[in-house]
Amino acid sequence: MTGGISPHPINATPEIQEITNTVKEQLEKKLGTNYSIFQAISYKKQLVNGMNYFIKVKTDNGYDHIRVYEAFKGTPNLVSVQQHKSLEDDITYF
């Protein structure tokens, strides 16, 4: 059953870091930058026809929130990004 975004952030797992690593190059291309620091911190998720992951990522420039869509039998793809976030900023739907 599909639904809203999970209410509370979950600490990033190795699986979430792997998803984050998969879209790193997509994000770097989109923003025209290269990251030496790219660490998933926490995330929320939303079940759709696949899974949306809303991931807080620590980067060289602070924190970004990225939205990644992964089809049930597909490859994760970057959907959007919110830059200039802080560690304290809540992860919300975007």
UniProtKB/Swiss-Prot annotation:
Task: Could you list this entry's UniProt keywords, alphabetically sorted.
Answer: Cytoplasm, Protease inhibitor, Thiol protease inhibitor
Q: Which GO terms describe its biological process?
A: hyperosmotic response; regulation of protein metabolic process
Q: Chief subcellular site?
A: cytoplasm
- InterPro entries according to UniProt: Cystatin_dom, Cystatin_sf, Prot_inh_stefin
Q: Name one GO molecular function term.
A: cysteine-type endopeptidase inhibitor activity
Location of the motif Secondary area of contact? 46-50
| Tagged with keyword Lipoprotein | no
Q: What are the annotated GO cellular component locations? A: cytosol
- Site keyed Reactive site: positions: G3
As for subcellular location, the record says: Cytoplasm
Q: Write out the function statement from the record.
A: Intracellular thiol proteinase inhibitor.
Q: Which family does it belong to?
A: Belongs to the cystatin family.
- Protein name per UniProt: Cystatin-A3
Please report the organism this UniProt entry assigns to the protein. Answer: Dictyostelium discoideum (Social amoeba)
